[in-house]
């Protein structure tokens, strides 16, 4: 089974964390046939942390996990912190193929999204 773990920074503001969880729930509904399991996880400041999110995916039956950093820029968290946490967690789940996708801001679709968002001003 294939899983997607959407990783955000995490916030002291619970509403911000809830938005990420809600986004993961929307992804579940819109990605039928692409991912069997979709969860949200956080780098820090909120539950579920990355190692716990990976465990949740494996416990749900995932044999392949894509970690998607929900970050716009390739700062330290994207370049160092997330890979370090994922690489430290991988040995705990040798039955799962765990890979990190490029961060959201690296997507070629970002230009269209920015223009569309700017054009939708109120």
Place the predicted regions along the sequence by residue.
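Active-site-proximal alpha-helix that buttresses catalytic centers in soluble enzyme cores
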Residues: 1-122
């Amino acid at each position: 089974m294939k899983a997607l773990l959407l990783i955000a920074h995490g916030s002291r503001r619970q509403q911000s964390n809830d938005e990420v969880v809600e986004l993961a729930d929307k992804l579940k509904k819109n990605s039928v046939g692409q991912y069997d399991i979709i969860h949200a996880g956080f780098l820090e400041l909120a539950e579920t942390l990355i190692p716990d999110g990976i465990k949740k995916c494996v416990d749900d039956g995932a044999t392949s996990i894509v970690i998607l950093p929900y970050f716009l820029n390739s700062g330290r968290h994207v370049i160092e912190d997330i890979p370090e946490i994922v690489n430290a967690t991988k040995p705990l789940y040798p039955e799962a193929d765990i890979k990190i996708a490029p961060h959201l801001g690296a997507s070629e679709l970002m230009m269209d999204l920015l223009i569309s968002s700017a054009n939708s001003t109120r």
